[in-house]
A protein has these predicted regions:
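Sec-dependent N-terminal signal peptides
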Residues: 4-15
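Short glycine/proline- and aromatic-enriched beta-strand/turn motifs that initiate or cap beta-hairpins
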Residues: 19-62
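Transmembrane beta-barrel domains of outer membrane proteins
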Residues: 42-44, 77-81, 118-122, 158-162, ...
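Outer-membrane beta-barrel transmembrane domain signature
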Residues: 135-203, 210-214, 230-232
Length: 232
């Protein structure tokens, strides 16, 4: 789960309010069968906006962990503005975490720094929103046995579509980036479209489908979830 607040964040930005939500998903993906929690926050101010999320997995096949956290990962980003009519916003971002691979072994999700620019489009009633980002990406100690940083790029799209007078929300993101992997690929793709039925202003029932290529391994994978979401 990631970046799933960024699209609705534009609405929050327009009206200068913050937004937060908590999600809990059960993952049906092969070899997973686990719970994942996501905490997200978006907060605008007169100089731009701050966004972060924290993902945690609670056990999974192959991690050797049945009672506890098997993965922790977070991203934090800051976008900058200097006037109210600004269309393009410079941005910086940090990603990092750690995960269990079994037998008591934990490996880092390498520190990653991104810098780039973003642009958002919205319909007149803000029921349809699209944000596109283009970033330079630096992954620390990724190459040559952990002694050399890797430089690349990342392209991101984030969207939200409100349907049935706001009772149904289709949202998600797609990332495409360059990263050399030990299984021989250089490019990776990850998308997590979500569909939510908004039972009330705060509570939603739905889920997501994780679509990835060269993300966990040298393959295309589809991993569905069922989820609950509470928006503060």
């Amino acid at each position: 789960m990631k970046k799933l607040l960024l699209a609705i964040a534009f609405v929050a930005f327009v009206f200068s309010v913050s937004a937060q939500n908590v999600q809990l998903h059960y993952d049906f993906g092969e070899g997973r069968k686990m719970l994942t929690s996501t905490v997200e926050m978006f907060k605008p101010d007169k100089y731009g906006s701050t966004f972060f999320f924290v993902d945690m997995d609670y056990g999974a096949d192959g991690t050797g962990i049945d009672n506890g956290i098997s993965l922790a990962y977070w991203e934090i980003a800051r976008a900058f503005k200097w006037n109210e009519t600004q269309k393009f916003m410079p941005r910086v971002e940090y990603n990092g975490g750690t995960m269990s691979i079994g037998d008591g072994i934990w490996i880092p999700i390498e520190n990653c720094w991104l810098a780039g620019i973003e642009r958002t489009w919205a319909s007149a009633d803000f029921s349809k929103i699209l944000t596109l980002q283009a970033n330079y990406k630096n992954i620390k100690d990724k190459l040559e046995g952990g002694t050399k940083n890797q430089n690349g790029f990342q392209l991101t799209a984030v969207w939200v579509i409100q349907m049935l007078e706001g009772k149904l929300t289709f949202t998600g993101f797609a990332d495409f980036w360059k990263e050399e992997m030990f299984w021989g690929t250089d490019y990776r793709f990850l998308s997590e479209p979500q569909l939510w039925y908004n039972a009330s202003k705060n509570f939603a029932i739905g889920g997501e489908v994780e679509l990835s290529n060269n993300f966990v391994g040298d393959e295309f994978a589809v991993k569905p979830t069922l989820g609950l979401k509470w928006t503060f």
